Amino acid sequence: HIAKFIMYATTVMNIIGITCLMFGFKFEWYWIKFTVYENRFTGCYVNPNLLGFISVVSIFCCHILSKGHFMRRIAEKIPEPGISKIWIVACLATNAFSLILCDSNASLVLALGYAIVYIVYMFFADKAGLSPSKIILKITALFLVGVFLTGSALMFRTICQEGFSVVVSKTTSVVDLLLGKTESELVQEGLTPEQREQLENDKITFSHENKNIDSGRKKLWLESINLFKLSPIIGISNGNIVLYSAEYSNGALEYSYHKSDLHNGFLTILVSTGVIGFVLFGIFGFRFAKHSAQHLFLQKKTYRDDVYPCLFAFLFAYLIFACFEKALLYDISFMVVWFWLIMGYMSCYITKFEPTLESQYLFHGKRLRRVTRTML
């Protein structure tokens, strides 16, 4: 039901946002700029990065809802009408288009990571007849596929942004004519250089105004090194990041939109909780990742037509995404809630469908043997 709601809601919101964009409808409510913010498409959301993340989540939900075995199992428990393929196609198209126009690099990394990890599973799902030579061949093929997908995605995004920029300029010109603007206001002949420069600045190109590919993250990450040195063992606490930055680093992080996060989930944990907290979080994450990967790749059956590979691929891709965004722990947002929700679904899936008792202990083999001896 959550996946269906996300699919329907995001499709409708994207259609509304793209329609408003084409006809030049923009407005500002308090500090929030809708449809376009800093030359990037926001649609009905508060910022482009949130739009990009929700677009990837919607594509992920569409992928889940297209799994036949999963949908048949759900239908057996909750009889209800099926999902029209028109909705799935519309959701995929509008969200992919919104992901391109919002120009969110981190969200594009999330989408590519999800696709590549899922392809890795598809390559190695069938373990019959695997040999060292075949494994090397598949790894080489996967590397080439990853390079091709990354290059194609970047090129396709640039082409779509430039093409739709022209479309938007044409449609807004038509709207201006219909609203009664004079020809002299629409044609650039006779305009001063300052007016022409203003027109160029107002033109929507759907690309970052800040041309640095890191979008200022490098400055945050370098600054975090100084904060980490203040208390490397137990950390400085998440709530002190901005305060300590103002006191010890000339206020380099004293910006309202940075809050107390370093745009890197792992780095934020390291600075906030020190080496001790980071190691504890790493142990928890490693044990869960090991268990989920073993459940996926070392089972006799495959999950080609089930949702477990989708959950695994999204969670793995999110860990890469967390290197560039406010994620994992301290930022209470839709992104963080969705990450822990997917992890919870994976845990329930493993506990329910793995036949061994050991799954409940996350490979505590020694503990399992002690429990068995005690019972005997």
Question: How does the language model describe each region?
Answer:
Residues 30-46, 259-261:
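Active-site-proximal inter-transmembrane loops
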Residues 21, 122-208, 222-230, 238:
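A membrane-periplasm/extracellular boundary helix in multi-pass inner-membrane enzymes
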Residues 42-58, 239, 262-265, 270-274, ...:
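Membrane-interface micro-motifs in multi-pass membrane enzymes
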Residues 71-84, 295-305, 357-376:
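Membrane-interfacial, low-structure loops and terminal tails that flank and connect transmembrane helices
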Residues 37, 206-273:
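Long extracytoplasmic/lumenal interhelical loops at the membrane interface
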Residues 3-31, 44-128, 291, 316:
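Alpha-helical transmembrane segments of multi-pass inner-membrane proteins
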Residues 60, 111, 115-119, 284, ...:
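Transmembrane alpha-helices of multi-pass inner-membrane enzymes
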Residues 124-125, 248-251, 273-316:
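Hydrophobic transmembrane alpha-helices and their immediate junctions
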